[in-house]
Amino acid sequence: MHKWWARQLGSVFRAICLYTLLGDPTRVSIRDYPESGDDASLSEFTDGNEDDELDIGALIDSVDLETPGGLWELYPQDVQVADTTVLDPFMGGGTSLLEAGRFGASVTGVDLNPVAWFVTKKEFEAAEIDPDDLEDAFKQVESDVSDELTDLYQTDCPHDGSHVADVVYALWVRSLNCVSCHETIPLFKDYRVAKGRYEDSDRDHVLCPDCGGIFLTDDISTESVCSDCGYEFIPANGPVSQGGMYGCPSCGLKYPIVDAIAEGQSYEEELYAIEYYCTDCEDEGAERSTYKGYTSPSEGDVKRYEDAAKQWAENDDLSKYTPDGEIPDGSITAASSISGNDIFQHGYETWRDMFNDRQLYCLSTLLRSIDKIDDPDVSEFLLLAFSDSLLFQNNFARYNSAGSKIEGALGRNSYTPRTSYAENNVWGTRAGRGTFTTTWQKLLDAVDFAHNPTERYLENEELHETESFEELISGEYTLLQGDMRDVSLEDEYDAVITDPPYYDNVVYSEVSDFFYVWQRLLLSDSYDFFEPETTPRSDSIVSNPATGKDGTTFEDELGIAFGRIRELLADDGILVFTYRNGDADAWGGLVDALCSEQFELTAMYPIAANASELFGDNKPNVTVIVVARPVTSPQGEPISWSALRRKAHRSAKRAREQIEESDQSPSEGEISLMELGRCLREYSQHHGQVHRRGETMDTVEVVAEFQNLVSGEITPDEIYLSLLEMETPSRRDLQRLCYSTNVSPNDLQRRGLVTDDDTFSIATWADESRQEYLASTADEDLTPLDQIHLLRQKSGNAGELRDQRDMDTTDELVELAAELARLTNDDGYRGLFHE
């Protein structure tokens, strides 16, 4: 319903709830459970009576690492767990609470951030609101302002002057003067407007820097000729280069953008292109390339903008519907160890500087209309949609020329100043994303789901959806804003399910201020914690140089938080949380924080990264489910490192055997993480009491030893063979296989085992990149796979093959050749060691 950062998938928390809350069979019931004949995989767990009633106790008892799938069969069922309480002390966007509530649990959520509280509040209220009331309120706002707002985003239809088209996106470029010759320089990185569509999908729309015309070209990296004025240029080469420099085409001077601003210049802005959508042409049956495309701005387009800017300047009543405070100095608003962007160096001072005048006029007009809705519950839903649309209504939003769409601000959890940006249609039209009407529709879809919740699941590799569940997305819930270390809470929760702060977590206070400063305009009179100018900073548990909090402070505060959780959790309760996989320092700090507050870490399970995380440097973000339980008796006796290592090795080995005997297929790295969890379970029973050579080992040292113990020596060869086993291996498969190993995807690419340019593919011995690697590698550095591929290359020449084979033949190579023949159906491998 609204942007929140690092959200875990709902399916992740549903799975966590399924395996966490179903502990006491007497509390569990399944609504509308199908007869066993309809679900053969569960028939063995029936009581055997004529009603085929499910024996939930037997089902729960059947689950272990070898047979984890029994409970999984209940994933798409309407499972209810009676008399169960769940706490999330770091609720964020509320996903954990919503999923626990679907199981019938009574849930309590806490978050320091008012935006998180407001978003989660409306998510729970979605099942309580009458959709007709929402529709009536929207129609009131639509009647009030939609015509005025849409009129300001219209342009003359390029194909028929008798009517107008809608502006989907208005594209702006900023400019500075050359500090030497004073020529005005538009700050383009290149002159590509957008990738071509439809019949022109192999071409690009480009802007002529001479006349401002827009035309199609075959290749932006080569000389292009403007179809309007004949100007010749290379569209890929704009004045702005890497490092934030801009070059003058007249005198050739290159100068830092931020230095020019520091010396007194300010950005000027110019409208350079419009993406339009003509509903009249579409309704008349025109081709898609006619009713949707790009055009140069006309005098009328400039006038529409100027009219809006004038109304904004002259309408004092609207000023109270836009934030006017100064942007706080912070770790992501100014340059710091967290972010290299410094918006102040680009001339930003107040929140209003993040929007152009037409945006300010339209957004304030829309918010004023929302404020007129009498019912505060309904008005808050409209405010939520308005707030979410702000991501795409600002001058940090960029136009994705390859995807022909707008990309919202804060995509990398920071404020990134743009030299060109996309202005969205505030109200919206038939095309485009992030408009008020599209975010409103997204909210209505969420409300509908809250009233009619379903679940999607895979069966026979096809996605299915259940019928609507009886339990709504609501139930008993309590949501509190405040510091979880201080707020008043009942104790004896059955489970704490959460996603706690990480060491290098998103600085939520700073990114959420972007929404908060708008939300508080309507909420400050109703909620005290929306009165301050910005969200709380000093109490956030995060490493933040702007508030003087380093890693040590973070670990101390996280430990206090776990201590508070221990106070609130029943002695037989369970703590389950998601955590980002990290190095020994990260895991060591976490284990110290847990064990120091009387928790025992009992298991770890890797999962895919959360919904918003991006992959960088070929390394995926691995999230781990961590399971811990309260310790009610004193921890174990002191132990030597050698004895602990033996215990941990046995436990890890047993875990691996159970996994390998199951029908699951985790990657080697994923298995290693589960083994690490078993090792840390053994250590948590002797926390702070492990001795080696007369000294007590610190936790980071122990974790590092365990990581070496479980990682083994996974080789690129093994990962390559695993990829060959797959029917259609992908880049994502490669990343998964490399999870928590000492191998990176780059290692395979460097060896020529995979290619990952425009498309991902598995290389063979015959690929040029593979042959180049083998030719450049010394004999003593060749792996068994390298040697087999060399033999396969020489198999066409009997003499060379005989010489190579006499030198290298081993049983390992013979077996590997047979395996490659099986995996690749290349019979050439079969004859490598036979005359």
Where do the protein language model's features map onto the residues?
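Conserved helicase motor "Helicase C" RecA-like lobe of SF1/SF2 P-loop NTPases
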Residues: 586-596
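A short glycine-rich, Lys/Arg-flanked "PGG" loop and its adjoining helix->strand segment in the class I
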Residues: 555-571, 596-597
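Short glycine-dipeptide loop
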Residues: 521-525, 564, 569-575
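Conserved SAM/SAH-binding loop-helix junction
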Residues: 94-95, 506
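Conserved beta-strand/loop positions that form the S-adenosyl-L-methionine
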Residues: 89, 110, 498-500
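Nucleic-acid modification enzymes, centered on SAM-dependent nucleic-acid methyltransferases
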Residues: 1-87, 101-492, 505-547, 561, ...
